[in-house]
Swiss-Prot record:
GO terms for cellular component: cytoplasm. The lineage of its organism: Bacteria, Bacillati, Bacillota, Bacilli, Bacillales. It comes from Staphylococcus carnosus (strain TM300). Its main location: cytoplasm. The keyword Secreted does not apply. It comes from the Bacteria. Belongs to the PPase class C family. This is Probable manganese-dependent inorganic pyrophosphatase. Binds 2 manganese ions per subunit. Its cofactor is Mn(2+).
Length: 308
C-alpha cells in the first residue's frame, strides 16, 4: 500500500505537530495502516514539553520529494506554508482552522475546515463522530494543542467547542488543564537561550496579501521586555531575512501570555501600512497592541485588509 504522509505547517507549533500524530492515528483506525506523521521543522520547547510529559515521540522530519505521493495536511493549507514539493503531491485530505488561500488541487479531496480555535478540536470531533476510542496519550496531545492555540483558553479564537473538548480531554488525559497548561506555555516562553534567528522564525508563517509577501512571526513570553531588550539584534536578523528572501514585510509579534497583550516589531516595505492596520503609530519600529494575542483572528485580517 502506498504511504500517506501527514504533516502540519513549516515552523511547526504544538497544534501542527500533535495534529499530525492524531490524524495518523485516526487514519489507522479507519484502516489506513500506511499513514505516518511527519514534521516540517524543529520541535519547539513548548511542544517538546508536552511530548515528554506524556511520553510521546516527535514525528520524523520530512525530507522526501512528495511528487505523486499521497498527503494529508493538518493545521494549514497555503502552499507557501507547506512542504516545498506540495504542489506536485496528491493532496487527499485537509483538516484545518485557518483561512483558505493559495491552495488548489487537481483532483477532488476531503476538506474539513471549521472556525474553531484549534485543529485538534476538529480531530476530537472526528473521533467522536466515528465512535473511535480516544486513548489517554491521544487525549493528552489533543488537550496540549488546544491549550497552546488558545493560550489556555484566553485567545479570542477559543470557542465553546474548544472549551468543551478540553474539558472532556482533561478527564481522559488525567491532568489539570490549568496547572499543566501554564507550565507547558511557560516552557515555550523563555527566549534567553534562543538566537535572534530562532526567535523570529520559531513560529513564523508567510502570507500573500495583495501585492505583498508578508512574514509574520510570533513569540510567546511572560516578559515582553526580555524580547525588546534584544531589539537591535532582532532587527539585524529580520533585515538579513528580508534581503535574502522574497518577503516585503516582516512583523514579529511578541505576545505576553500572562496579560494577553502583544507588542509588534515591524520592518520592511511600506511598514507604516501595518501600523495603520491597527490604528497605531510605530515608535522605533514597535507598537503596543492591547488585547491582541491571535495571529489568525486579530493580526492577519487587518493586515490583509490594509495591504489589499
Amino acid at each position: 500500500m502506498e504511504s500517506t504522509y501527514i504533516f502540519g505547517h513549516k515552523s511547526p507549533d504544538t497544534d501542527a505537530i500533535n495534529s499530525a500524530i492524531i490524524m495518523a492515528e485516526f487514519e489507522k483506525l479507519n484502516g489506513n495502516d500506511s499513514a505516518k506523521a511527519y514534521r516540517l521543522g524543529k520541535v519547539n520547547p513548548e511542544t517538546q514539553y508536552a511530548l515528554d510529559y506524556f511520553k510521546a515521540e516527535a514525528p520524523e522530519l520530512l525530507t522526501e520529494d512528495l511528487t505523486d505521493k499521497d498527503v494529508i495536511l493538518v493545521d494549514h493549507n497555503e502552499f507557501q506554508q507547506s512542504a516545498d514539493t506540495i504542489e506536485s503531491a496528491k493532496i487527499r485530505h485537509v483538516v484545518d482552522h485557518h483561512r483558505i488561500a493559495n491552495f488548489h488541487t487537481a483532483a477532488p479531496l476531503y476538506y474539513r475546515a471549521e472556525p474553531l480555535g484549534c485543529t485538534a478540536t476538529i480531530l476530537y470531533k472526528m473521533f467522536k463522530e466515528q465512535g473511535f476510542e480516544i486513548k489517554p496519550q491521544i487525549a493528552s496531545l489533543m488537550l496540549s494543542a488546544i491549550i497552546s492555540d488558545s493560550l489556555l483558553f484566553k485567545s479570542p479564537t477559543c470557542t465553546e467547542q474548544d472549551k468543551a473538548a478540553a474539558q472532556a480531554l482533561e478527564n481522559i488525559a488525567g491532568v489539570d488543564a490549568q496547572e499543566y497548561g501554564l507550565e507547558m506555555l511557560k516552557a515555550g516562553a523563555s527566549t534567553v537561550d534562543k538566537s535572534p534567528v530562532e526567535i523570529i522564525n520559531a513560529d513564523a508563517k508567510t502570507f500573500n496579501m495583495g501585492d505583498y509577501s508578508v512574514r509574520i512571526g510570533q513569540v510567546n513570553t511572560v516578559d515582553v521586555n526580555e524580547i525588546l531588550a534584544r531589539q537591535a539584534e532582532l532587527e539585524q536578523a529580520i533585515t538579513e531575512t528580508l534581503s535574502g528572501a522574497e518577503y516585503d514585510i516582516f512583523v514579529l509579534v511578541a505576545t505576553d501570555i500572562l496579560n494577553s497583550d502583544s507588542t509588534i516589531l515591524v520592518l520592511g516595505k511600506d511598514k507604516d501600512k501595518i501600523a495603520k492596520a491597527f490604528d497605531v503609530e510605530l515608535d522605533n519600529n514597535t507598537a503596543f497592541l492591547p488585547g491582541v494575542v491571535s495571529r489568525k483572528k486579530q493580526i492577519v485580517p487587518p493586515i490583509t485588509a490594509a495591504l489589499s
